[in-house]
Design a protein with these regions (language model features):
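Non-transmembrane, aqueous-exposed alpha-helical and coiled segments at domain scale
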Residues: 1-189, 194-279
Length: 279
């Protein structure tokens, strides 16, 4: 059994909140850079160049890439041989509180969805814990802005809808979103499971690097097909047209009921943020 202090968790989460909001993951940066090099439409290319300049300025000045510094979605892979010395969830919330305060990040969380009222410290975080073998603890902070989150959709398709219904739903989601999610977008797509699980799969898919395909060749092929089809829609960066509507997408799948075909699309913008640390 290995002990990890609650303070170590707080320190890691605070650091990751700032890092994720000021520096994009290398795979997202590479996809954005590739897109601006290859985009043929002048207005779209100029827009991508501006996004790249903004990204560079944020990195150089340690400033947020986007004014919407997001809801702190925290994913933890916790070894079953780990003992936390203190309150685990309280340590995460305190890390978010400290990171958003020390990093001068926008406080975007309301205490109640209907009665509202800003909590003033961007807590509580949305915490997901996955138990794994061993004595490790890996924490990923993925701040999620709601311009793109609000464009996300879930649908309980019929089994008869099949792969064509699946494709149609994904493309329809991108078309309905238009310029609202600040494209070029990144898509996390879930298929299978239940109503709640498919939404989780879509969110989980956003954690996979854009240069890592689904290990199942069938779904890896679907990822390539969908990316091509989405970029042929012509929405383009910020809705100005062009061939760069989506930087990348990932599909996560799981078994489902014989009577169902759940599908969820979690839409993210070009500022798809995540930062990880292993304790």
């Amino acid at each position: 059994m290995r002990n990890i202090s609650a303070q170590a968790i707080t320190d890691a989460v605070a650091r990751l909140c700032i890092e994720a909001n000021t520096r994009l993951p290398q795979d997202v940066q590479a996809a954005l850079d590739k897109a601006r090099q290859e985009e043929p439409w002048p207005l779209a290319k100029n827009t991508l160049d501006l996004l790249w300049s903004n990204l560079s300025a944020a990195r150089e000045k340690d400033l947020p890439i986007c004014q919407d510094t997001g809801m702190a979605c925290v994913f933890v892979e916790l070894g079953t041989d780990v003992h936390i010395d203190g309150s685990f969830e309280a340590a995460i919330h305190e890390g978010v509180r400290r990171g958003y305060t020390d990093g001068y990040l926008r406080m975007s969380i309301v205490a109640d969805p209907l009665r509202r009222g800003n909590t003033g410290d961007n807590t509580p975080a949305a915490i997901t814990v996955h138990l794994v073998d061993g004595d490790g603890c890996t924490i990923t902070v993925a701040p999620k802005g709601f311009g793109s989150e609000n464009m996300s959709r879930i649908q309980m398709l019929k089994p008869a809808d099949g792969v064509e219904g699946f494709r149609k739903f994904v493309l329809e989601t991108v078309q309905l979103a238009g310029s609202n999610p600040c494209p070029p977008s990144v898509l996390g797509i879930g298929v299978g499971g239940s109503f709640d699980k498919v939404a989780y799969l879509a969110k989980k898919a956003l954690l996979r690097p854009l240069d890592v395909p689904n290990p199942d060749p069938y779904y890896a092929g679907l990822e390539r097909e969908l990316l091509t089809a989405i970029n042929e829609l012509g929405i383009g960066p910020q809705g100005f047209g062009g061939q760069t509507t989506c930087l990348g997408l990932a599909i996560e799948q799981m078994p489902t009921h014989v009577a169902g075909l759940p599908v969820a699309v979690n839409v993210s913008c070009h500022v798809t943020r995540r930062a990880s640390a292993t304790l």
